[in-house]
């Protein structure tokens, strides 16, 4: 997810909503961390710099199929307008990237069509299953697509601008 984190905030993860159950984990270092990918471990992940962070946790079965390999990646959020209203379907285009000012992410003025938004997870178009990081705004709330099918169409007109506030999981189209 995309979160605003203050310097020295600490994160830990769990498979349950409880510290008493599940599999609690952090990373393998006590040092404050900047953007990067870190191996799972027992230490809290301490954030080095304040700002918005895209936090992605991956858990994969080890090659010997005996353990779960955990990793935590932290990066700068990169949010885009895609499809007919923005950059199309073939490559990430910086002209269609949202800009963050004062905690709000703002899009460039969109083209007419059905709005589709995504979070860029890797540097290669298509390598990140960008469709799984798609989201849209419904009734003023940000809703992610996840592994489901296409979301309900959100029609927009030429020149409208999308604003997103991930602190409140809200957005608007004006």
Residue ranges and their predicted role:
Residues 1-174:
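Insoluble glucan recognition modules
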């Amino acid at each position: 997810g995309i979160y605003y984190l203050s310097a020295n905030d600490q994160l830990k993860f769990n498979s349950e909503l409880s510290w008493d159950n599940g599999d609690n984990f952090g990373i393998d270092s006590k040092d404050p961390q900047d953007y990067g990918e870190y191996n799972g471990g027992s230490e809290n992940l301490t954030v080095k710099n304040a700002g918005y962070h895209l936090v992605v946790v991956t858990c994969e079965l080890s090659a010997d199929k005996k353990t779960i390999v955990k990793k935590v990646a932290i990066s700068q959020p990169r949010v885009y307008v895609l499809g007919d209203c923005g950059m199309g379907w073939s490559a990430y285009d910086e002209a269609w990237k949202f800009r963050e000012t004062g905690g709000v992410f703002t899009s460039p003025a969109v083209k007419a069509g059905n709005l589709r938004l995504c979070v860029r997870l890797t540097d290669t178009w298509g390598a990140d299953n960008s469709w799984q990081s798609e989201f849209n705004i419904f009734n003023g709330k940000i809703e992610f697509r996840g592994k489901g099918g296409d979301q309900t169409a959100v029609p927009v007109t030429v020149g409208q601008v999308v604003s997103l506030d991930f602190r409140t999981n809200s957005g608007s189209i004006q």
